[in-house]
């Protein structure tokens, strides 16, 4: 298998603290670049854990279609602005941030007061505009999760009618693009591939960490396949042949041989197949003539038994 290398050829931080990283991975065998690119993209876009604002409480507001006196934005605008905030919580517990601002003021993300467990990535992002002589009191809830979690109206906490739920986007990666280039022809004339992958995050994690975490998830997914233990189905007993089911009476044995076998609990050909020639001779009153008779009767239906126990 080819030993490939990973090079980060570009890293940018935008004004909103979003980060872009571009990586080159290669050389790879034909087809491997597509496999890597698709797998990494799926995990990067939907499998990484992140943080998001999941609910907002605004003093004096109990539904999302309200307006706030002295505030330029309506409640829906404020909820949308909060939804777009990039935050990074280092705990799995619910975290709450609060602010109280008196106008005139531009209310920004950095005005939110959190515990030391939560970092606001883009502190300059606008939340609302408060006019002179008015104030805004606001509370946001931050949780960790994976993927996208829409508001479940059926399970909303009706006891907190002023807590406005938000569709939560936990995905720390905003965009992933990849392209595949052919590299120099290797020995033997086989063409190699190189994967170029661009990862854009919201700033709560770096592209390097996002790539590493997605790779670790894929390793954990595939690792059990390397040590698969096959569980064999219990073997089915072979069905007995039609000949073995023939009753003893149909062998047309002499009365003496028939009676001796019956006394020995031999009732069918299948019972006889457990005997050797020596075993037949040990049956009481069963001589060599009767044994030969049984051997001949069995041979007529295509069955033979061993001469001795050791050759069975």
UniProtKB/Swiss-Prot annotation:
SMART domains associated with the record: RPOLD
Region feature (Alpha C-terminal domain (alpha-CTD)): 245-312
Pfam families: RNA_pol_A_bac (PF01000), RNA_pol_A_CTD (PF03118), RNA_pol_L (PF01193)
EC number, as in UniProt: 2.7.7.6
GO molecular function, one term: DNA-directed RNA polymerase activity
Region described as Alpha N-terminal domain (alpha-NTD): 1-229
Domain of life (superkingdom): Bacteria
Keywords per UniProt: DNA-directed RNA polymerase, Nucleotidyltransferase, Transcription, Transferase
GO cellular component: cytoplasm; DNA-directed RNA polymerase complex
Transcription in keyword set: yes
UniProt-listed GO biological process terms: DNA-templated transcription
Annotated catalysed reactions: RNA(n) + a ribonucleoside 5'-triphosphate = RNA(n+1) + diphosphate
Disulfide bridge map: none
Subunit-level organization: In cyanobacteria the RNAP catalytic core is composed of 2 alpha, 1 beta, 1 beta', 1 gamma and 1 omega subunit. When a sigma factor is associated with the core the holoenzyme is formed, which can initiate transcription.
Written domain comment of the UniProt record: The N-terminal domain is essential for RNAP assembly and basal transcription, whereas the C-terminal domain is involved in interaction with transcriptional regulators and with upstream promoter elements.
Reported function: DNA-dependent RNA polymerase catalyzes the transcription of DNA into RNA using the four ribonucleoside triphosphates as substrates.
Family according to the record: Belongs to the RNA polymerase alpha chain family.
Protein name stated in the entry: DNA-directed RNA polymerase subunit alpha
Species assigned in the record: Prochlorococcus marinus (strain MIT 9313)
